[in-house]
Amino acid sequence: MAQVYNFSSGPAMLPAEVLKLAQQELCDWHGLGTSVMEISHRGKEFIQVAEEAEQDFRSLLNIPSNYKVLFCHGGGRGQFAGIPLNILGDKNVADYVDAGYWAASAVKEAKKYCAPNVIDAKITVDGKRAVTPMSEWQLTPGAAYLHYCPNETIDGIAIDDTPNFGDDVIVAADFSSTILSREIDVNRFGVIYAGAQKNIGPAGLTLVIVREDLLGKASVACPSILDYTVLSENDSMFNTPPTFAWYLAGLVFKWLKQQGGVAAMDKINQQKAELLYGVIDNSGFYRNDVAQANRSRMNVPFQLADSALDKLFLEESFAAGLHALKGHRVVGGMRASIYNAMPLDGVKALTDFMLDFERRHG
C-alpha cells in the first residue's frame, strides 16, 4: 500500500507504531483472550492501564503533585461549560480572551453561566492577522479567572507566551490542539484542558489538569459528570470512562517518551513548521495571512494564488497520498495540520508536492 499522510485537523493522525500495536492487541489483550475494550474499567488489568497512562502524562508535562489529572467525557466543548461551573465560585465575572474561532465558542457557552468580559485580542500587523501581546491584555480586577486558547486550529493562530499575571489570577486554557507539542510550565495555570483527538489519541476522551485548591467550588447546578471534585474523588471513574480511548492515549504517551519526550517533539515540530512556512513564504503562488509571531506550528492554513485551482490541488494531493488538506469552511483554502504524529517526511512530501504543483500551474 502506498504511503498516506493524514493532515486532518482532528480526529487526527496517530503514530503508526501505536496503531500497529493496538492492532496486534485488539482481539487478545495481554493474553486474556478478550479485547481491552471488553474488560471492566474497575478490574485490576484496566486500573493498571489507567494508572500508567496518568503517570506517563504527568512525566511528559512535569505536572506538579498538587494538580489532579482527570480523564473525562465531553470534549473541549464540554469544558467550555465545565470551567465556569467549577471555577466561578461566588463570582459572576470572568475574563475571556478572543483570538479566534474556538475562543469565541468558549465565550458563547460561558454566557450561560456568567458575565464574560471579552478581551478582543485580534489585531492586524503589516496586513497580517496577529494577537495582542499577553502583557497588554486588560484584565478585570477580581475576575474569577482568565480563559484563553493557545492554539486556534481554524485560524492557524498561536499564543505561545507564558502567562505571568500573578498568583491572584487563575488561568484556564484550552490546549486541545497544542498539548504535548511544546514544553509548558503547568504551574502558571489553574486549569488546562485538552480534547484527545489531535495530539493525545482518538476522539471521545478529554484530559483536564486542575490545581487542587480549585476543587470543591463547583456550582450546585454543575452536572456530576463535569464536577472536577466528583471526578477526582472517583479517579475519573464516576461512570464508565472511554476505556479504549484511555488505553490508546496511554500508548501514545509511551510512544512520546520513546521519541525523547516533549522537548524532542518541540524541536521536531519547529522543523516541520519552518519547512512548510518556508515554502509558502518563498512562493508567489501560496500565501499565509498570519503574522510570524502568532503562527501556529500545529495548523498551517494557506491559500493558492488562484482559488479556481483549489479543487485540482485537493484532487492531485489526495492522489499523491496527502489527505485532508481542505481548509475549514469558515476560512476556505487549504490547511495542513502537522501534529506530533506527523513525521518530518510527511511534511517534506507535502512541500515537494506544493513546489511541483506550483511549477505546473503557477
Curated annotation (Swiss-Prot):
<feature type="binding site">
    <location>
        <begin position="239"/>
        <end position="240"/>
    </location>
    <ligand>
        <name>pyridoxal 5'-phosphate</name>
    </ligand>
</feature>
<dbReference type="InterPro" id="IPR015422">
    <property type="entry name" value="PyrdxlP-dep_Trfase_small"/>
</dbReference>
<comment type="function">
    <text>Catalyzes the reversible conversion of 3-phosphohydroxypyruvate to phosphoserine and of 3-hydroxy-2-oxo-4-phosphonooxybutanoate to phosphohydroxythreonine.</text>
</comment>
<feature type="binding site">
    <location>
        <begin position="76"/>
        <end position="77"/>
    </location>
    <ligand>
        <name>pyridoxal 5'-phosphate</name>
    </ligand>
</feature>
<feature type="binding site">
    <location>
        <position position="102"/>
    </location>
    <ligand>
        <name>pyridoxal 5'-phosphate</name>
    </ligand>
</feature>
<feature type="modified residue" description="N6-(pyridoxal phosphate)lysine">
    <location>
        <position position="198"/>
    </location>
</feature>
<dbReference type="InterPro" id="IPR000192">
    <property type="entry name" value="Aminotrans_V_dom"/>
</dbReference>
<dbReference type="GO" id="GO:0030170">
    <property type="term" value="F:pyridoxal phosphate binding"/>
</dbReference>
<comment type="pathway">
    <text>Cofactor biosynthesis; pyridoxine 5'-phosphate biosynthesis; pyridoxine 5'-phosphate from D-erythrose 4-phosphate: step 3/5.</text>
</comment>
<comment type="similarity">
    <text>Belongs to the class-V pyridoxal-phosphate-dependent aminotransferase family. SerC subfamily.</text>
</comment>
<dbReference type="GO" id="GO:0005737">
    <property type="term" value="C:cytoplasm"/>
</dbReference>
<keyword id="KW-0963">Cytoplasm</keyword>
<feature type="binding site">
    <location>
        <position position="42"/>
    </location>
    <ligand>
        <name>L-glutamate</name>
    </ligand>
</feature>
<keyword id="KW-0808">Transferase</keyword>
<keyword id="KW-0664">Pyridoxine biosynthesis</keyword>
<dbReference type="InterPro" id="IPR015421">
    <property type="entry name" value="PyrdxlP-dep_Trfase_major"/>
</dbReference>
<keyword id="KW-0663">Pyridoxal phosphate</keyword>
<protein>
    <recommendedName>
        <fullName>Phosphoserine aminotransferase</fullName>
        <ecNumber>2.6.1.52</ecNumber>
    </recommendedName>
</protein>
<feature type="binding site">
    <location>
        <position position="174"/>
    </location>
    <ligand>
        <name>pyridoxal 5'-phosphate</name>
    </ligand>
</feature>
<comment type="subunit">
    <text>Homodimer.</text>
</comment>
<dbReference type="Pfam" id="PF00266">
    <property type="entry name" value="Aminotran_5"/>
</dbReference>
<comment type="pathway">
    <text>Amino-acid biosynthesis; L-serine biosynthesis; L-serine from 3-phospho-D-glycerate: step 2/3.</text>
</comment>
<feature type="binding site">
    <location>
        <position position="197"/>
    </location>
    <ligand>
        <name>pyridoxal 5'-phosphate</name>
    </ligand>
</feature>
<keyword id="KW-0028">Amino-acid biosynthesis</keyword>
<dbReference type="GO" id="GO:0004648">
    <property type="term" value="F:O-phospho-L-serine:2-oxoglutarate aminotransferase activity"/>
</dbReference>
<dbReference type="InterPro" id="IPR020578">
    <property type="entry name" value="Aminotrans_V_PyrdxlP_BS"/>
</dbReference>
<dbReference type="GO" id="GO:0006564">
    <property type="term" value="P:L-serine biosynthetic process"/>
</dbReference>
<keyword id="KW-0718">Serine biosynthesis</keyword>
<keyword id="KW-0032">Aminotransferase</keyword>
<dbReference type="InterPro" id="IPR015424">
    <property type="entry name" value="PyrdxlP-dep_Trfase"/>
</dbReference>
<dbReference type="GO" id="GO:0008615">
    <property type="term" value="P:pyridoxine biosynthetic process"/>
</dbReference>
<feature type="binding site">
    <location>
        <position position="9"/>
    </location>
    <ligand>
        <name>L-glutamate</name>
    </ligand>
</feature>
<dbReference type="InterPro" id="IPR022278">
    <property type="entry name" value="Pser_aminoTfrase"/>
</dbReference>
<feature type="binding site">
    <location>
        <position position="153"/>
    </location>
    <ligand>
        <name>pyridoxal 5'-phosphate</name>
    </ligand>
</feature>
